[in-house]
């Protein structure tokens, strides 16, 4: 378990003090894959450096497995850091060492008896699928294979925690998928806690059990991955989810729906027309509930746009629907959606120019 309490970090700059982290509180359970995501400058890299105490925070505490780290001396920290493996974006392999030699290096530094090293390295290479490349040099293998070497090296001292700092951001989509599958497999086989630092929502969607969203050095949202995709609460999260799923309406689609709402208001004064964004999960995500809603409440419901994503085996649907009928029927339908615990965001209504703000795709 990783427990971070009230963590803050400030840097001195030529323009004054810069607050990189402010009041961070996180509880990461043992054995889970936890994502930390945010735009550039959000504080992600500073946070990961604080977790392994490469950067000392100005205030707050960091505990791993019940051991508080911020009060330890440098000598004590060296021992504790063996419990934390690190996978980097840039691989950081030694060019003059073979694949085998790079994985063996942390064992040599840790003082593992020489006769025990070969067996341990061979097991690690088998775990990451590189036993056939043991005698190759970094210049002779691909980027994805280099990252596998980095993962094996990070696991050499049997860490409790594996920190992945943008480990897939320099890889192509297929290689990224393979590396994420490997990390998930390692997590399941060894029980190591994996912390994924990333700016890619696609990475979070594929591997993370839970996710914390950082913005300007603060945690602005934290939830299960499927909940973050289904019902993002913060503007930063909504923007990142929309970009990853293309789940927002385009300007042209919104304008067309507004024209339909205006036309209905002119033709049928007193009637109601609402454009809703519905977020559904599980069995409801396919949209069968919508047809039931129309039938039960005598509504005319048009599907404007829909998308269903598989978030680690859970269907998460985003539906934009135009509901038209009497005001009472519309209110009854809203009550029914609330009873099913379905998130509803009203995007537009009559009159069309008196509508809430919308998160619109560019």
Swiss-Prot record:
InterPro entries: AAA+_ATPase (IPR003593), ABC_transporter-like_ATP-bd (IPR003439), ABC_transporter-like_CS (IPR017871), ACT-like_dom_sf (IPR045865), MetN_ABC (IPR041701), MetN_ABC_transporter-like (IPR050086), NIL_domain (IPR018449), P-loop_NTPase (IPR027417). GO terms for cellular component: plasma membrane. Its EC number is 7.4.2.11. The complex is composed of two ATP-binding proteins (MetN), two transmembrane proteins (MetI) and a solute-binding protein (MetQ). PANTHER family: AMINO ACID IMPORT ATP-BINDING PROTEIN (PTHR43166), METHIONINE IMPORT ATP-BINDING PROTEIN METN (PTHR43166:SF30). The gene is metN. Coiled coil: none annotated. Part of the ABC transporter complex MetNIQ involved in methionine import. Responsible for energy coupling to the transport system. One of its GO terms (molecular function) is ABC-type D-methionine transporter activity. This is Methionine import ATP-binding protein MetN. Belongs to the ABC transporter superfamily. Methionine importer (TC 3.A.1.24) family. SUPFAM superfamilies: ACT-like, P-loop containing nucleoside triphosphate hydrolases. It is found in: Cell inner membrane. Keywords: Amino-acid transport, ATP-binding, Cell inner membrane, Cell membrane, Membrane, Nucleotide-binding, Translocase, Transport. ATP binds at residues 38-45. PROSITE patterns: ABC_TRANSPORTER_1, ABC_TRANSPORTER_2, METN. It comes from Bordetella avium (strain 197N). Residues 2-241 form the ABC transporter domain. Signal peptide: none annotated. It is an enzyme of class 7 (translocase). It catalyses: L-methionine(out) + ATP + H2O = L-methionine(in) + ADP + phosphate + H(+); D-methionine(out) + ATP + H2O = D-methionine(in) + ADP + phosphate + H(+). CDD domains: ABC_MetN_methionine_transporter (cd03258). It comes from the Bacteria. It is a peripheral membrane protein.
């Amino acid at each position: 378990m990783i427990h971070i309490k009230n963590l803050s970090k400030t840097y001195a700059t030529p323009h004054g003090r810069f607050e990189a982290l402010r009041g961070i509180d996180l509880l990461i359970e043992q054995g889970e894959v936890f994502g930390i995501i945010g735009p550039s400058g959000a504080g992600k890299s500073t946070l990961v450096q604080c977790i392994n105490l490469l950067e000392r925070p100005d205030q707050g505490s960091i505990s791993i497995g019940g051991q508080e780290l911020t009060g330890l001396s440098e000598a004590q920290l060296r021992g504790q850091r063996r419990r934390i493996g690190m996978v980097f974006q840039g691989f950081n392999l030694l060019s003059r060492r073979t694949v085998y030699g790079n994985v063996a290096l942390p064992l040599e530094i840790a003082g593992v008896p020489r006769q025990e090293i070969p067996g341990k390295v061979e097991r690690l290479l088998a775990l990451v699928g590189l036993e056939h490349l043991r005698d190759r040099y970094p210049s002779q293998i691909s980027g994805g294979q280099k990252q596998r070497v980095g993962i094996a090296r990070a696991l050499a001292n049997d860490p409790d925690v594996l920190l992945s700092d943008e480990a897939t951001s320099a890889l192509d989509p297929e290689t990224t998928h393979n590396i994420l599958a490997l990390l998930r497999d390692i997590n399941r086989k060894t029980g190591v806690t994996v912390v994924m630092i990333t700016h890619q929502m696609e990475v979070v969607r594929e591997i993370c059990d839970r996710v914390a969203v950082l913005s300007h050095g603060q945690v602005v949202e934290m939830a299960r991955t499927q909940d973050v995709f289904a019902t993002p609460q913060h503007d930063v999260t909504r923007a990142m989810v929309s970009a990853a799923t293309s789940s927002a309406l385009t300007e042209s689609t919104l304008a067309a729906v507004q024209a339909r709402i205006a036309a209905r208001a002119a033709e049928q004064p007193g009637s109601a027309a609402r454009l809703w964004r519905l977020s559904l999960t599980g069995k409801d995500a396919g949209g069968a509930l919508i047809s039931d809603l129309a039938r039960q409440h005598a509504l005319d419901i048009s599907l404007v746009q829909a998308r269903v994503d598989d978030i680690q085996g859970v269907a998460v649907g985003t539906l934009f629907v135009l509901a038209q009928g009497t005001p009472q029927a519309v209110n009854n339908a809203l009550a029914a959606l609330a009873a099913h615990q379905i998130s509803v965001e009203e995007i537009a209504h009559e009159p069309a120019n008196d509508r809430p703000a919308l998160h619109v795709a560019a």
